[in-house]
Curated annotation (Swiss-Prot):
Names of required cofactors: Mg(2+)
PANTHER family: GERANYLGERANYL PYROPHOSPHATE SYNTHASE, THIJ_PFPI FAMILY PROTEIN (AFU_ORTHOLOGUE AFUA_3G01210)-RELATED
Signal peptide from the UniProt entry: none
Binding site for substrate: 100, 236, 240-244, 329-330
Low complexity bias locations: 375-419
CDD domains reported for this sequence: Trans_IPPS_HT
Protein name: Sesterterpene synthase btcA
Region (Prenyltransferase): 334-722
Short motif (NSE/DTE): ranges: 236-244
Length: 725
């Protein structure tokens, strides 16, 4: 650069340019490697061993490892990561590499399914795709759960942002664009920005550096990152070309590479196209440098952390280039038909400890690619046709109000003959339920089912069935709750009864109970049916006490409150436990009673607390909606014990509210919240929640001992719900 960066790099050390050039590397940018390369190597080996343990499909040894004789890939691309954060992002990056390699030889449909399974395993707060093969998804989930848990424990806000982007902006889109339809280099680069997951990659860099820069603050710098990303894409294409071309000849693998594209579009040889790509790489590197200089000159007061992140992009480009020029991942095919196993690589290249670049061996010269002077007709796998589409046939393809044919094959035969058109679906009774199912969900029940299935190991069909039954009951209860609470909002959208009428919504809600019971009777033994009905009975009794206390302004004791919670909230979790254990050959539910009861109580009190304090809840349900309802929640019970005078005032507000259907004014709500805060009620409630979180962690440890198997996904669920900032 004309004006070299003044950033002080703390975690990395320089690789001399002449050392890099001796290996064939031609980047024009400065190269740095993390001082703790051994940390990255260890995390890489753990990811390889874990892949073998949980998936055991051979790709842990067939995939080219991040380890190389010049250093670990992640030591170059995360060269300024904090040492304590380097292991988890290295682990996640290498798992992504193995997964990417494993899908290269798959058909397009198979690749999309595999990406969806991996994406589902990373899901933190949404219901996943029920048509996926449960066993494969479960193995993916067990593979990544410990890594996800570590990420969230280090930095939950940035970790969540990073993981969601990794899931939504890479795995969910990487195979959904048609490479064969691309007609220009610009389209190709845009395609690879999604296919290569650039957004989640930069978030991983931020996480590693301990940053969490808002998108709005980064937006003015977006143009700087573009040429860096283009150089990254073309660098990978340049050095992976020989491997990809060889795989297309020997295995019929798909080629997705700018060299093939330029050869095809410009009618030039592969060798000529490769030279074009080489020139473009250095051109884009120079453009990146120019844009950095211009931005810093025009914005001299740029915050140091933002400047550092901008300049790290150049280190990423250069470090990735140096690694690509030397890594077994791109070059081992020249000596054998698969990459060297990472353990063997470590033995051959023992430079796993941090060392001075001058003392390391950086002299290996690259071998030439296969001589190809003219481009033959493009080689493509039959699976890469643009007409290929993922198949999706499952119980979740239609509304849970109506998707029952797979559970009742004789339903049509058993229906009494009738000429009435009204008996044919869809019915008006389905509409409120379909609407509720379309609203965003936190997905706690779904995540809990999948986490427990690590132990229960029931089939994919039964997982889908149980999710559908519990979803019906949950949606039914939400429809009724909104009516009983006179709530105008549900998950940030209009409540069902405000759209379909109160009468129709009540009818739809009760119909869902009937449908759920019908599905249970068709798929479970009579003893399970009886237990299911008993749980439904307790759920309604629990709800009746909640309504009774509210109407009569009768504040329960803490013991009475939790008895109500065990019935109203806990029974839903108890129900999924009943259904899962009845389909499992490995587990019965008696060992889980304490965990489920504690989880139900924790979930309800957490909900009570968040309703009064969370901006997220305000967006979904309205501000302090429990106060509008006059709900006798846990904080109010605490207030009765801790501040009787404040309790009397709040009950007076609720009593006056009963004669007025309007919502409480913002001023009144602020006053009530201030009473809670000054009396220590909110702090006391949060302390109780923290104690329940500790108890739940102890319960999971106990269950792991009983089951003889760890369950990191349960820890991830508890971490995502945790209020321990």
């Amino acid at each position: 650069m004309a004006n070299p960066p003044v950033t002080e790099w703390k975690q990395s050390e320089a690789i001399p340019a002449h050392v890099a050039q001796e290996t064939g590397c031609f980047t024009t940018l400065p190269i740095r490697i993390h001082k703790n390369n051994s940390i990255a190597d260890q995390a890489t080996l753990e990811s390889i061993n874990d892949w073998k343990q949980h998936l055991d499909d051979g790709w842990e040894s067939r995939s080219g490892s991040a380890i190389s004789k010049v250093g670990n890939w992640c030591s170059f691309i995360f060269s300024e990561a904090l040492p304590e954060r380097l292991p988890c992002i290295t682990y996640l990056a290498n798992i992504g590499n193995i997964h990417d390699d494993a899908t290269e030889d798959a058909t397009l449909d198979e690749a999309i399914t595999s990406h969806a399974q991996f994406s589902t395993a990373l899901s933190l707060d949404t219901d996943d795709e029920p048509s996926l093969q449960e066993a494969k998804t479960r193995r993916f989930r067990h593979l990544v759960s410990n890594c996800v848990l570590e990420i969230l424990s280090i930095d939950r806000d940035m970790g969540t942002r990073m993981i969601v982007s990794y899931q939504k902006k890479w795995l969910d889109v990487m195979e959904h664009l048609n490479y064969e339809g691309i007609e220009s280099l610009e389209e190709y680069l845009e395609f690879r920005m999604l296919n290569g997951g650039m957004e989640p990659f930069w978030l991983m860099c931020q996480f590693g550096m301990g940053l969490n820069i808002p998108d709005a603050e980064l937006a003015p710098t977006r143009h700087i990152f573009e040429p860096a990303e283009w150089a990254l894409v073309l660098t990978n294409d340049y050095w992976s070309w020989g491997r990809e071309y060889n795989a297309s000849l020997t295995k019929g693998s798909r080629i997705v590479n700018s060299i093939e594209l330029l050869s095809r579009l410009r009618n030039i040889s592969y060798d000529e196209a490769k030279e074009v790509v080489r020139d473009l790489i250095t051109t884009y590197e120079a453009e990146y440098e120019r844009r950095v200089q211009d931005f810093l000159r025009e914005n001299p007061s740029t915050q140091m952390y933002l400047r550092q992140f901008i300049e790290v992009a150049g280190l990423v480009v250069a470090g990735n280039h140096y690694w690509c020029a030397n890594c077994p991942r791109h070059h081992a095919w020249k000596e054998q038909d698969q990459a060297v196993h990472a353990v063997d690589q470590l033995e051959e290249f023992p430079a796993v400890e941090a060392q001075s670049p001058s003392s390391a061996t950086h002299t290996a010269a690259p071998q030439e690619d296969p001589p190809v002077t003219e481009a033959p007709s493009p080689i493509s796998s039959p699976s890469s046709s643009s007409s290929a589409k993922p198949s999706s046939s499952s119980a979740a393809d239609s509304s849970s109000c109506t998707s029952t044919s797979q559970h009742s094959p004789s339903e049509t035969d058993s229906t009494p003959p009738s000429s009435l058109h009204l008996l044919k679906s869809p019915h008006p009774v389905d509409a409120p339920c379909t609407y509720m199912s379309s609203l965003p969900s936190k997905g706690v029940r779904s995540t809990l089912i999948h986490a427990l299935n690590q132990w229960f190991q029931i089939s994919s069909r039964n997982v889908t069935l149980i999710k559908e039954i519990t979803s019906m009951l949950h949606n039914s209860s939400l429809i009724l709750d909104d009516i009983q609470d006179q709530s105008p909002l549900r998950r940030g959208k209009p409540a069902a009864h405000t759209i379909f009428s109160t009468a129709q919504s009540i009818n739809s809600s009760t119909y869902l109970f009937v449908r759920a019971m019908q599905m249970v009777s068709e798929n479970f033994e009579s003893s399970v049916q009886m237990s299911f009905l008993e749980i439904l009975q307790r759920m309604h009794i629990g709800q009746s006490y909640d309504l009774h206390w509210r109407f009569h302004l009768q504040c329960p004791t803490e013991d009475e409150y939790f008895e109500m919670v065990d019935a109203k909230t806990g029974c839903m979790f108890e129900m999924l436990l009943l259904l899962m254990s009845s389909k499992s050959r490995h587990v019965k539910d008696h060992s889980f009673t304490s965990f489920i009861r504690t989880f139900g109580r924790y979930f309800q009190v957490r909900d009570d607390y968040m309703n009064l304090t969370s901006g997220e809840y305000t967006a979904g349900k309205g501000w302090c909606e429990d106060l509008d309802e006059g709900k006798l929640s846990y904080p109010l019970i605490e207030c009765q014990k801790m501040a009787p005078a404040s309790f009397t005032q709040i009950m007076g507000i609720f009593r006056a509210k009963q004669a007025d259907t309007a919502q409480l004014s913002d001023e009144t709500k602020k006053y009530v919240i201030e009473l809670f805060r000054k009396s220590g009620v909110l702090d006391s409630t949060l302390d109780w929640i923290m104690e329940m979180e500790r108890q739940l962690l102890m319960e999971v440890k106990r269950l792991e001992g009983v089951m003889g198997d760890s369950n990191p996904m349960l820890y991830v669920l508890l971490q995502t719900l945790s209020l321990n900032q």
